[in-house]
Amino acid sequence: MGKIIGIDLGTTNSCLAIMDGKTAKVIENAEGHRTTPSVVAYTDSGEILVGQAAKRQAVTNPDNTFFAIKRLIGRKYDDKAVQEDIKKKVPYAVIKADNGDAWVATKEGKKMAPPQVSAEVLRKMKKTAEDYLGEPVTEAVITVPAYFNDSQRQATKDAGKIAGLEVKRIINEPTAAALAYGVDSKKGEQTVAVYDLGGGTFDISIIEIADVDGDNQIEVLSTNGDTFLGGEDFDLALMNYLIDEFKKEQGIDLHNDKLALQRVREAAEKAKVELSSAQQTDVNLPYITADATGPKHLNIKVTRAKFESLVSDLVMRSLEPCKKALEDAGLSKSDITEVLLVGGQTRMPLVQEKVKEFFGKEPRKDVNPDEAVAVGAAIQGGVLAGDVKDILLLDVTPLSLGIETMGGVMTKLIERNTTIPTKKSQVFSTAEDNQPAVTIHVLQGEREMASANKSLGRFDLADIPPAPRGMPQIEVTFDIDANGILNVSAKDKATGKEQNIVIKSSSGLSEEDIEKMVQDAEANAEADKKFHDLVTARNTADNLIHSSRKAIQELGDKVTAAEKEKIEEACKELEAATKGDDKQAIESKTKALEEAFAPIAQKAYAEQAQAAVAQGGAKAEEPKKEEDVVDADFEDVEDDKK
């Protein structure tokens, strides 16, 4: 069996590591560097450049040089994040694919999906590993931001496949970093906060490292993040400042000059790096542009204090997910024993200072922020290959998953921060008599209202035998694998007929969607509870109306006309109440119908008892409804149903 390599597929840079005996080792690329820029360029001659070679020619070939592709992977073109944060920040063309995904195009019109471009970076990683090992490499563990959704994970696996790699596992970046730290750590039980601020994404994970029966158990307690916060945004803030200053001095806006823009972008990134160790730097770009009076030069002095003032809001943005991660883990800042900094952007002194202030302790400096994630991926590869035997990794899913049920409510089957892999089943039923089919509507998010969450997909379970509502037993199963990818199935327990769906990348969630869901859930917790209580009252009322009318019909002549009229009047009043939003009115009318129906129910019960005695005490068995059956508002897919 060949080696399973570990790849950190980053927004800005990527890194490769392999297990060398019992130790993970970072492998240098052909240029002698331990990290490779995640940049791909297509030249006029048809050559594809990857890494440093692509980055070097970006200034002269901005339309065909693709960077920060990770921010597009698994996303829809119409996503607000794509429109606002990507299209306005990159010189290359971002287009809408036929399936609605965000793709890129060269100036010659060649269209490419983000996984295709990312695959070029992975292909270089694969070649580097093969050159080092002297044997073919076909399997890999690839890392993704912890807050990547299902479609982004699927798209990352697709990129691996395009590159000729079987992706044995998708692992979360902070978890990989903790894995790298945990293997070397021999300090017993620890609770570690992994603060991962990379080139394009931010993650925070709270992770417990413990010795369990001689094994190093690494368990993720919670995770949070922002997939649109990273070093690229810091570069952009400085780039815009330089362009604005140049405009003040020269009256020329460089935003419309792609070549100049690329030069300023590179200068901003270089200045940012220098300001992590120096108090000030000069950005000097001669012949940046020209007008009627001659060539113009950009020469601007930037101090560390000025740069920090430009990006302080970005640093502060990273602290809110940290608070949420602690809350979800049920921990306070004092419970954290170690803070790990991962990602190149954490080299910035301001980031280190704010993280220290937030957690109240000095972050560790002995973890290489650029390499820890790849090292962790290699260790996970070693675990999967059987080469590393004393590590147990328990990761989590970042968002709750469930289905839409009666009254437009989301019924959660798997809560956020549940350890994966996991499988959860629940029995649901039909909402109408003789309903031949149900539609399973799969949702992702934190809100009570189904419409306020993200729709991941729908599928139908047909050919349900005719039966009264509430009788069919439809078992819905959610199965999340170790990669965090979801499979949903529905089975009619009476017939054994089953239907399933693997959530595809066409149902991607933008980070804005995810963040909005969590924020909305917290901000609207009270409104959600009221809505939930109102829907519960409506469902109770609907069930009572249905059962009351059905009983009257079955009892026939045993019920007087006056009794029938009284029941029907109470049903109509309750129906009218359910159309409104007054929970108390619904509950009041429900009680009135119960009281009106009580004498008839007692009479019917007495008659049934007499009939049973007459039949020699024979006891009629009725099908038993499972206790956890939830009435689901499934839509009938039969076209001619009235």
From Swiss-Prot:
Question: Which Pfam families does its entry note?
Answer: HSP70 (PF00012)
Segments of skewed composition (Acidic residues): 628-642
Region: Disordered; residue ranges are: 615-642
Q: What induces it?
A: By stress conditions e.g. heat shock.
Check the UniProt entry and state the signal peptide residues, or none: none
- Output the CDD domains linked to this UniProt entry: ASKHA_NBD_HSP70_DnaK-like (cd10234)
**Keywords for the protein's UniProt record, in alphabetical order:** ATP-binding, Chaperone, Nucleotide-binding, Phosphoprotein, Stress response
InterPro entries reported in the protein's UniProt record:
ATPase_NBD (IPR043129), Chaperone_DnaK (IPR012725), Heat_shock_70_CS (IPR018181), HSP70_C_sf (IPR029048), HSP70_peptide-bd_sf (IPR029047), Hsp_70_fam (IPR013126)
Q: Any idea which GO molecular function terms this record carries?
A: ATP binding; ATP-dependent protein folding chaperone; unfolded protein binding
Described function: Acts as a chaperone.
PANTHER family for this protein: HEAT SHOCK PROTEIN 70KDA
Q: What is this protein called?
A: Chaperone protein DnaK
Q: Which organism is it from?
A: Francisella tularensis subsp. tularensis (strain SCHU S4 / Schu 4)
- Tell me what gene encodes this: dnaK
